[in-house]
């Protein structure tokens, strides 16, 4: 099974840190967290924090943890479908926490009604989730209506939330895709879907005509993608696209199809703390 490493990198100057001290509180098993291996954190509309771990879903109210585990099939209690989780994502519109599991599909927890919805592969339904191994979840540009779901080896899925049906984006439907192994994806307002592959570089899929641009690291080109293992893609408030890889951070220029790269430099106190970037917010 693949190994996940979730890390948060805070890029702060020494002057800023000196002027603004931070109090860091450790939250672990001793404080009620179900497992110290945390892969993802999100915050819901009510301000609560949710943690995806290797052993269940955790909600933190600022004082204590509430843990959600998979119930036995014989139980009538609704629950998550697997305890080994990859990601949690707070829906920006609905009171829902979306939960990506490692081998048990996609779950949705409505924290107002305290109910679960489950999306799993069904061989008899061609519009069901194509695989139960989900790596990443994010909203489409039409927040609250659609969801992009990345899978480890079967490409990208688009979920129509109203119908519960999935549209598949893989080599069968988009032959130009270089790989179906995906870590992450982000949709831009111009109809482009940015896809981060597992050791396969970056793809930009036009949702209008299904054409694909593909980028990989070129050791002879300092303005190429810094690494081929693309772990996270972030669109900032100015529309800039940031790419996190195992070999550094890059800012993508859509006009020139080039990258400005930011690597770890031990001699630069104002640079990135590490070249391994796996999560950005």
Locate each region found by the language model.
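Carboxylate-rich, polar loop motifs that coordinate divalent cations or form catalytic acidic clusters
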Residues: 1-281
